[in-house]
């Protein structure tokens, strides 16, 4: 196990969520499931693109919120589309600026690497146009960021 591992509290869906996340990420695997006397999953562990996670079925006392999100750094628009569409499916929700909530209530930021590249340029006016364009988006669209950067 890595030194720091996100630990996710679920009501009863830890195993279901783990299997879902493993299906969404191409480089992912189940690491283990520990079961209680009733045979139901108590804790789960899995890996998404080299990042280990643990999950716990512990009841409805705590819910996920926007204070903690999983940041997915995407190579291109196709990858943004893949993660966005998969994570909002079956009851997930879109939010602004590349944020979305999956059907288990976990928050994600689906961000193309181009956003940082375009915002980090040496021309503050161009960077501000990119920021202003992004602030109007739900899912981030790379082509629209580029248009804003170019002043179109």
State what each model feature region is.
Residues 1-5, 65-69:
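Short, solvent-exposed beta-strand edge segments and adjacent coil->beta transition regions
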Residues 126-152:
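Acidic/histidine-enriched, glycine/proline-rich intrinsically disordered or flexible terminal extensions
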Residues 29-31, 52-54, 106-114:
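Active-site-proximal beta-strands of protease catalytic cores
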């Amino acid at each position: 196990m890595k030194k720091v591992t996100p630990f996710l509290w679920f009501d009863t869906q830890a195993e279901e969520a783990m299997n879902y996340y493993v299906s969404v990420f191409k480089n992912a695997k189940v690491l283990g499931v520990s079961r209680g006397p009733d045979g139901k999953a108590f804790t789960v562990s899995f890996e998404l693109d080299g990042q280990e996670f643990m999950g716990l079925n512990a009841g409805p006392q705590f819910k996920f919120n926007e204070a903690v999100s999983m940041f997915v750094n995407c190579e291109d628009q196709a990858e943004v589309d893949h993660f966005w569409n998969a994570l909002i499916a079956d009851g997930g929700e879109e939010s602004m600026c590349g944020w979305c909530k999956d059907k288990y209530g976990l928050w994600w930021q689906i961000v193309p690497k181009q956003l940082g590249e375009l915002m980090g340029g040496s021309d503050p006016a161009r960077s501000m146009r990119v920021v202003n364009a992004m602030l109007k988006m739900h899912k981030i669209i790379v082509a629209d960021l580029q248009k804003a950067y170019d002043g179109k």
